[in-house]
């Protein structure tokens, strides 16, 4: 799932994530390695927010609902719901394995990406000689299907051989990680055509 540029909402979510890192007492204006610390709290919060954007409401309802977390597997005593425990776990795991400055740079790069920034998207697409396959998922609210359709319509205006497919997938933006048989057949067919 993709779009010709990041939406205002995407940029807003990424800025909240970056700000959580910058506000971490261990961030030290990005020089945390000089202080032998890691801004884990900020990175954890950033990932928790980011992870929410990858999931659909349907998936979260089906997987977690409003179920309470059992006391044996609670990560801390302030947790009531399974979704809270899940996000805490995902945030902790990510904060132990990812660099905070890299996260800031990566999200800034995504925010600044714009296929038509320097000129009309049609001008940029004219440079493409390959055929395009755009796949989206109905449940993806981070990059909704209509954003991928923008790419395909611009490709068609430039006589670029393109295909656009929207698949069911209850997992939101993360749908590409599940039921890979659904889209692997589409990709194989596209490559062989």
What are these regions (language model features)?
Residues 3, 138-140:
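Residue-level signal for short, function-critical loop segments
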Residues 141-150:
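Conserved alpha/beta-hydrolase "acid-adjacent" motif
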Residues 89-90, 105-124:
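Active-site nucleophile elbow and catalytic-triad environment of alpha/beta-hydrolase enzymes
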Residues 101-108, 185:
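Feature representing long, continuous alpha-helical segments
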Residues 1-93:
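Alpha/beta-hydrolase-fold enzymes
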Residues 128, 134-136:
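Short beta-strand/loop motif that positions the catalytic acidic residue
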Residues 149-193:
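Catalytic active-site module of serine/aspartate enzymes centered on a nucleophile-bearing elbow/loop
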Residues 125-129, 156-158:
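Short, conserved loop/helix-junction motifs that constitute active-site signature segments
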């Amino acid at each position: 799932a993709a779009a010709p540029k990041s939406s205002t909402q995407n940029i807003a979510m990424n800025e909240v994530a970056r700000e959580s890192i910058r506000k971490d007492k261990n961030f030290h204006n990005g020089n945390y390695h000089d202080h032998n610390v890691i801004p884990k709290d900020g990175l954890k919060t950033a990932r928790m927010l980011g992870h929410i954007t990858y999931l659909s409401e349907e998936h979260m309802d089906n997987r977690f609902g409003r179920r309470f977390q059992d006391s044996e597997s609670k990560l801390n005593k302030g947790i009531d719901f399974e979704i809270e425990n899940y996000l805490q776990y995902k945030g902790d795991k990510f904060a132990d394995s990812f660099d905070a400055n890299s996260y800031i740079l990566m999200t800034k790069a995504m925010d600044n990406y714009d296929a038509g920034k320097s000129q009309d998207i049609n001008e940029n697409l004219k440079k493409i000689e390959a055929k395009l396959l755009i796949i989206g998922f109905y449940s993806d609210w981070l990059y909704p299907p209509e954003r991928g359709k923008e790419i395909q319509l611009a490709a068609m205006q430039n006589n670029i051989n393109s295909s656009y497919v929207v698949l069911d997938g209850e997992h939101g933006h993360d749908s590409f990680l599940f039921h890979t048989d659904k889209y692997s057949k589409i990709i194989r067919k596209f490559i062989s055509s």
